[in-house]
């Protein structure tokens, strides 16, 4: 695993910054927590710059806390993945959701492409080399489940696994029901909660999202550490789902 100094600050240095966030094509001023920037050490300066390219959103399942969790996951995965460049990986994590597309939008399957395009623009303005830029944009493009792409570089494999780890386990449970609430979905279908005799509809029922998507995610991990962590989190996810169904008497 490699790292270089481009965009890095001195170890322990805290960047105090005020970041400008996109919202519907307009720049907005908003203060960014120095502690959040510090979480991306030794790439605090890079984080402070790239975060200005993020859409401002009220989606708590794809907020700054999500970026921090994905970065924590990515650093763990990179320890066992040969050839990963930590700085390129940090840039990919920071920009992987820079264009926000709501779950119910017809453009949802284009979210990673749109984010990759903006990521390329951001890195070009920072003067990044074409090869490094391409590694980052490829990782951003491939990370999305909706895109259905297979990652081939270490950075892309790590980002995809790190992002998907945040969709399973207990955090995944919380994000699932949070998103369902935002979209106005019901908790479950009252006549057949487990969907044994009907087509699953996770746009209408939060619980349907477990068998339709979440419970199948653990089989698609491509990094060594990612597979191991996915098995652990999948067990928590399955236990929650089974317990929920049991309480409903279904």
Walk through the language-model features, giving the residues of each:
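Hydrophobic, well-structured mid-protein blocks that either form specific transmembrane helices
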Residues: 122-157
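Divalent metal-dependent phosphate-bond-processing catalytic cores, especially two-metal-ion Mg2+/Mn2+ enzymes
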Residues: 30, 36-38, 55-82, 95, ...
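His-Asp-centered metal-binding catalytic motifs of divalent-metal-dependent phosphohydrolases/nucleases
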Residues: 86-105, 111, 115, 135-145
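An active-site-proximal "capping" alpha-helix that borders the catalytic cofactor pocket
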Residues: 70, 111-124
């Amino acid at each position: 695993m490699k790292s270089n100094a481009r965009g890095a600050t001195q170890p322990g240095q805290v960047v105090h910054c005020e970041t400008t966030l996109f919202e519907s094509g307009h720049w907005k001023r908003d203060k960014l927590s120095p502690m959040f920037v510090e979480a991306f050490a030794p790439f605090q300066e890079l984080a402070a710059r790239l975060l200005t390219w993020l859409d401002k959103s009220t989606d708590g399942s794809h907020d700054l806390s999500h970026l921090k969790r994905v970065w924590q996951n990515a650093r763990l995965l990179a320890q066992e993945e040969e050839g990963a460049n930590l700085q390129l990986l940090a840039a990919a994590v920071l920009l992987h959701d820079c264009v926000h597309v709501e779950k119910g939008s017809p453009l949802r399957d284009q979210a990673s492409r749109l984010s990759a395009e903006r990521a390329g623009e951001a890195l070009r303005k920072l003067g990044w080399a074409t090869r490094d830029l391409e590694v980052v944009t490829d990782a951003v493009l491939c990370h999305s489940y909706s895109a259905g792409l297979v990652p081939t570089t270490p950075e892309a494999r790590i980002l995809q696994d790190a992002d998907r780890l945040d969709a399973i386990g207990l955090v995944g449970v919380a994000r699932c029901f949070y998103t369902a609430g935002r979209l106005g979905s019901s908790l479950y279908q009252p006549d057949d909660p487990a969907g044994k005799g009907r087509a699953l509809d996770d746009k209408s029922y939060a619980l349907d999202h477990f068998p339709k998507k979440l419970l199948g995610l653990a089989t698609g991990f491509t990094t060594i550490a990612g597979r191991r962590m996915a098995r652990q989190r999948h067990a928590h996810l399955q236990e929650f789902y089974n317990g929920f169904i049991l309480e409903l008497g279904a």
